[in-house]
Amino acid sequence: MNEQRSKSLIQLFESISALERKVANEWNSRNVLGFSKSHIKILELLATEGPKRPSAIAEKLQVTTGGVTVLTTKLIKSGYIERTQNELDRRAAQITITTEGLKVLEISRSHIDSLTEGIFGNLTTEEIQMMHQLFLKCIK
């Protein structure tokens, strides 16, 4: 790898790290509900796709089932989701979002909209699409 490319990659890495910190700081400063992004992703998943088994949630979020247990425990204690037995297979637990969970999700969506607009609002639609494509290319 040539020296200029190496320098550019290091600068890119540092910029991505700075953006990560900015997103985390913005999330924390606006997070009046006290939930992580993963908690909100679970609520979003259940709201859009319906009840799920913990293993399906783990697969979608790309975390372990143990991680899902930790995340869902806080949401259950808060009354935002419920754990029920699957009617077809009594051995299988199923996670469902509650009415209160839907309300909290709406509040979170508003916070996320505000956060993303604050961070990316100065970009054009074309720049946002280009950035998205570049991130997807890096992930593959």
What label would you give each PLM region?
Residues 50-93:
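Canonical helix-turn-helix DNA-binding module
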Residues 25-64:
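N-terminal helix-turn-helix DNA-binding core of bacterial DNA-binding proteins
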Residues 6, 11-12, 16, 107-140:
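Terminal interaction helix/tail motif
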Residues 1-33:
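N-terminal leader segment of winged-helix/HTH proteins
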Residues 41-44, 103, 130:
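Pre-recognition alpha-helix immediately N-terminal to the DNA-recognition helix
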Residues 33-39, 98, 121-124:
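Short helix-coil-helix linker/hinge
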Residues 87-108:
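Basic, amphipathic "hinge/linker" alpha-helix immediately C-terminal to the N-terminal HTH DNA-binding motif
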